[in-house]
A protein has these predicted regions:
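Conserved beta-loop-beta element that borders a ligand/cofactor-binding pocket
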Residues: 134-156
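N-terminal Rossmann NAD(P)H-binding glycine-rich loop of SDR-like oxidoreductase domains
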Residues: 5-25
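Short-chain dehydrogenase/reductase
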Residues: 86-90, 122-133, 154, 158, ...
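NAD(P)H-binding glycine-rich loop region in Rossmannoid oxidoreductase-like domains
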Residues: 37-38, 43, 47-91, 101, ...
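Substrate-positioning beta->alpha
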Residues: 159-163, 177-200, 206-210, 220-223
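Mid/C-terminal beta-alpha module of Rossmann-like enzyme folds, strongest
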Residues: 201-265, 296-306, 312-315
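Alpha-helical membrane-targeting segments
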Residues: 163-188, 235-278
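Conserved Rossmann-fold NAD(P)-dependent oxidoreductase catalytic core, especially the SDR/UDP-sugar
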Residues: 72, 91-130, 146
């Protein structure tokens, strides 16, 4: 009998790549899709689509009914205030956990969180990701669960980091923060492979794991700029932008977004995240418990990302 898995965020960046990876396994896939995103559904991958969202308890019950595993990829990455993030990243997690916990037998629950949860004081986003993790631990009961905390995820289809890579392809790298800041990255296909490895292993339940691409000590902005220059065959010039100037712009952007009812990406909280000196992850525990080893180097990941977005290097 085929095992079944429920996925949220399946039409998004990470969820879409995970669907493609699971399509080559024996998992039978059921996925949640918002009615407004029905046109984004990939064909011949998902066995059943459940129309609904994280605020609709009935659709969540249908999503998880009788499944062996739940992978929660959906989440809010932008918002005008804490309540906007918590509605999805905290309350949505709690509802899905309660729906899954009510199943017999109970499925294994995988929450795709973020390394940002390590520093909840920095932003509303980071705080909501930490609270979402706490909501899982608080409401899971005897249901087995795992939290994955990937570092910054990039790859073809990513709309958050691609604008930065496009600027670098044009020869300009706008940089804020200290030259001493270090951060880890993770190619999206390596993240999907880690989830599949964990589905096979069943180890380390009831804990969280950090993840990155295996580059010890992370990267500096100079490392990223040099990698883009190698891949693109073009010199990239770094332009240092003063943090107070960026913070001022972020403050005005947030105020304008609130007036217009938009969900902004650039906010004072996001600036604090970007200028935090240490976003270096640690793969040790995850590799020990699952055998997962990231395969995609930074140069190869950038090459694949920019190849899929040829306009990035033409404009």
């Amino acid at each position: 009998m085929r095992r079944s898995i429920a996925i949220t965020g399946a039409t998004g960046f990470v969820g879409g790549v995970l669907l493609k990876r699971l399509a080559s396994t024996d998992w039978q896939i059921r996925a949640l899709v918002r009615p407004a995103s029905m046109h984004k559904r990939p064909s011949q991958v998902v066995s059943e689509w459940v129309a609904g969202d994280l605020e609709d308890m009935e659709s969540l019950r249908r999503l998880v009914a009788g499944v062996d595993a739940v992978v929660h990829c959906a989440g809010a990455v932008r918002g005008a205030g804490l309540v906007n993030f918590e509605r999805i990243n905290v309350d949505g997690v709690a509802r899905l956990v309660l729906a899954a916990r009510a199943q017999h037998p109970k499925p294994r629950f995988f929450l795709i969180s973020s390394l940002a949860a390590r520093e909840p004081h920095l932003s509303h986003y980071a705080a909501s990701k930490r609270k979402g993790e706490e909501a899982l631990a608080l409401n899971a009961g005897s249901m087995p669960w795992v939290i994955l905390r990937p570092s910054a995820v990039y790859g073809p289809g990513d709309l958050e980091l691609l604008p930065l890579f496009r600027w670098m392809c044009r020869g300009i790298a706008p940089v804020i923060g200290s030259a001493k800041s270090r951060f880890s990255l993770l190619y999206v296909e390596d993240l999907a492979e880690a989830i599949v490895c964990y589905l096979k292993s069943g180890m380390g339940l009831g804990r969280s794991y950090e993840m990155h691409d295996g580059h010890a000590g992370g990267y500096s902005w100079g490392d990223i700029i040099d990698a883009v220059a190698r891949v693109n065959g073009r010199t990239v010039y770094q332009i240092k932008i003063p943090v107070p100037l960026v913070m001022l712009g972020a403050t005005f952007n947030l105020a304008a977004a609130r007036m217009c009812g938009r969900a902004p990406m650039l906010t004072p909280g996001k600036v604090r995240e970007l200028t935090h000196p240490n976003w270096v992850g640690d793969n040790t525990a995850l590799t020990r418990d699952t055998g997962w080893i990231p395969q995609v180097t930074l140069d190869e990941g950038l090459r694949q990302t920019l190849r899929q977005d040829r306009a990035a290097c033409r404009k």
